[in-house]
Amino acid sequence: MKIVIASSHGYKIRETKTFLKQLGSFDIFSLTDFPNYYAPKEVGSLPEENALAKGLHAARELNSWVIADDTMLMVPALNGLPGKLSATFAGEDACDKDHRKKLLQEMQSLESIVDRSAYFECCIVLASPEGKFFKTRGICEGYISHQEKGSSGFGYDSLFLKYDYKQTFAELSEDIKNQVSHRAKALQKLAPYLQDLLEKQLVSRN
């Protein structure tokens, strides 16, 4: 079964590919295989709004089942920021390091773990060319470190510590992160829908 990962981000593609290969026999592609495809601009205030828009658009344009996701980092003490600005917190043209630096600056007066609490929210959408879709949600709670730690991952990983771990996401091995992260939780909830699609395809072939 052909399925397209609606992302050109190497880490997201790798994590989703690993998950799909464990489930069954998929012909896996990503947006890197479609250089002429243009994704819609993310304008939603919630992860599910962006994931749904990306998924339905890509499925229709590429004529394939698609997996799309959107993730936001929420810091309650900052009224939910970065939130929908997670990818542009320090500006449209800023890099991940700039976003992390701005977050640390915004939180410099917050000392306790309670005040520095944060969570990642991820929504994943499985969409068909006909407009059918299934969506799942994963949340990972933790807090923001006072300084960057670790060199793996991307985005805010080097600042985020999951409550029951003493390492940031950027310090965890990729295998462990892929089991406990917000995206991992959302992908795991998607498994029954994908397995059902595979079974239906096998039946139709027979």
From Swiss-Prot:
Disulfide bonds: none annotated. Signal peptide: none annotated. Transmembrane segments: none annotated. One of its GO terms (molecular function) is ITP diphosphatase activity. Substrate binds at residues 7-12, 71, 154-157, 177, 182-183. Its cofactor is Mg(2+). Mg(2+) binds at residue 70. Binds 1 Mg(2+) ion per subunit. One of its GO terms (biological process) is nucleotide metabolic process. It comes from the Bacteria. Pfam families: Ham1p_like. Its EC number is 3.6.1.66. One of its GO terms (cellular component) is cytosol. SUPFAM superfamilies: ITPase-like. It catalyses: XTP + H2O = XMP + diphosphate + H(+); dITP + H2O = dIMP + diphosphate + H(+); ITP + H2O = IMP + diphosphate + H(+). Keywords: Hydrolase, Magnesium, Metal-binding, Nucleotide metabolism, Nucleotide-binding. Gene3D superfamilies: 3.90.950.10. The active site is at 70 (proton acceptor). Belongs to the HAM1 NTPase family. Pyrophosphatase that catalyzes the hydrolysis of nucleoside triphosphates to their monophosphate derivatives, with a high preference for the non-canonical purine nucleotides XTP (xanthosine triphosphate), dITP (deoxyinosine triphosphate) and ITP. Seems to function as a house-cleaning enzyme that removes non-canonical purine nucleotides from the nucleotide pool, thus preventing their incorporation into DNA/RNA and avoiding chromosomal lesions. Homodimer. This is dITP/XTP pyrophosphatase. It comes from Chlamydia abortus (strain DSM 27085 / S26/3) (Chlamydophila abortus). The lineage of its organism: Bacteria, Pseudomonadati, Chlamydiota, Chlamydiia, Chlamydiales.
